[in-house]
Amino acid sequence: MTISDLREAMDMDMEVSFDYKGINYFIEPDAKSDKWMVFCSLKPDVPSFMTMNEVLDMKIDDMPLKEVLPLVTNAMY
């Protein structure tokens, strides 16, 4: 998965999930706002609400998402 794949899926309001280092991440549009809910299996009931640009700019393990996405497994969108 690439950052372009993620951006394209988000442009179509699609849910996206992937695993990185055994941790599941799930991103879905919030029905009540123009933000996205980002869930992590470490805190499954506590989503982070972010704009699309914030999601695309977020870091995982101190690495930009664009560097993490090519390393993920089980990517679905």
Name these PLM-found stretches.
Residues 48-77:
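Mixed-charge, Lys/Arg-enriched low-complexity segments
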